[in-house]
Amino acid sequence: MIRASLISLVAVAAIALTGVALGGSQSDLAAVRSATAPFHDLQAAMDAGYTFQLPDIFGDTCIANLDNPSAGAMGVHMVSLARVGNPSLDPTDPEALVYERRNDGSLKLVAVEYVVFDTGQARPSLFGVPFDWNDGSRYDLDPFYALHAWVWKPNPSEPAGIFNAWNPRVGCED
């Protein structure tokens, strides 16, 4: 009887702790959404120091997956150079905002991106997810680490989903 009670107690505690861990990550993402909600307004993003559209070396401001078009795109980036130069990572203060170009030419906020230049440091991570390394050549930049969080548009990609660099539901067609 005591053994069965202890097993039940351990099982309930494990479920409860798992719920806290999962809830914690959801609350972290909710905090990101709350902090970036004002940036649905492009003027608010510019007023906060985000520079409109980071083009790649081809002059494209909408970043598509050239190697695997079916993987989708990243979208149009607005970057804060002051935030990129800051070595600390704050989930509620991303280095870049990612927008999807709509059919009418307007932009809709779909994701945030965290960027850290590679200076030989350990690979950074947020939300328990390691950043992707990028050699920077497509953007005429030094090598950097990046992590996308699709907090405003669902990303069905596997295995990373919300943290995948590319979203098949985002395109760069004009």
What do these predicted regions represent?
Residues 1-4:
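Positively charged n-region of N-terminal signal peptides that target proteins for export
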Residues 8-17:
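Bacterial N-terminal signal peptides
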